[in-house]
Amino acid sequence: MKIEAVIFDWAGTTVDYGCFAPLEVFIKIFRKRGVKITDEEARKPMGLLKIDHVRALTEMPRIANEWERVFGHLPTEADIHEMYEEFEEILFTILPHYATPIDGVKEVVASLRKRGLKIGSTTGYTREMMDIVAKEAEIQGYKPDVLVTPDDVSAGRPYPWMCYKNAMELGVYPMNHMIKVGDTVSDMKEGRNAGMWTVGVILGSSELGLSEWAAETMDPVELREKMEVVRKRFVENGAHFTIETMQGLENVIEQIEKQEFIIS
């Protein structure tokens, strides 16, 4: 089997180590309304279209109960849209600072292109958000061949439509000749739903939730334990392979191409 293309996620996978840009904004918009949410809660829906992310947070039982305690009713669609508008406003001001390619990404992408592979991408950000991120990432040396956002299709993750549109624009078929690489549960579901080889990257991921400094200075045993939790979570949600860093991707490609794996 010949792999012809790789579809990467953005924040937490190729840029923004740890996926911190949206995290603090989600926490802030709820805190402003007297509802405290944890980092873990804020990260759980990561990878979804951002308004869907806000909606998913309001549907978490603990958060919904806390909201009802504060306001006397459960969150409404009007509440969700109000928070999302505020989320967008804040996020736009900080996005340029969270578009730095993660170490190793540019080198791996260059190597993949030398092998003749095409590079696509999907995201949970809107097109307007990605106009900012993609422009800054390109200045810093990272530019995929194709970028598809939820605005470009009928629905974002976990639906496979962004991957299908990548396939069409890249001119690659069948889908099992492509790999989806991401750092969230929704990435794994997106890739599997699209019938692609699906790979979860652990270090720098939203699922791990550590800054580069925290990962480098953490006790190695503790870090390994946290990474194993993320690895299992990826596999439980459909990952065919997991890699610690992007540098492990080419080994995955070689494994797929040398053996007759069947996507199940």
Swiss-Prot record:
Catalytic residues (UniProt): 9 (nucleophile), 50 (schiff-base intermediate with substrate)
InterPro entries tied to this protein: HAD-like_hydrolase_sf, HAD-like_sf, HAD-SF_hydro_IA, HAD_2, HAD_sf, PGP-like_dom2, Phosphonoacetald_hydro
Gene Ontology biological process terms from the UniProt entry: DNA repair; organic phosphonate catabolic process
GO terms, molecular function: magnesium ion binding; phosphoglycolate phosphatase activity; phosphonoacetaldehyde hydrolase activity
Pfam families, per the entry: HAD_2
Catalytic reaction(s) noted: phosphonoacetaldehyde + H2O = acetaldehyde + phosphate + H(+)
Keyword annotations: Hydrolase, Magnesium, Metal-binding, Schiff base
Keyword Nuclease: no
Subunit and interaction comment: Homodimer.
Job of this protein: Involved in phosphonate degradation.
Record-linked NCBIfam families: HAD-SF-IA-v1, phosphonatase
Name of the protein this chain belongs to: Phosphonoacetaldehyde hydrolase
Gene: phnX
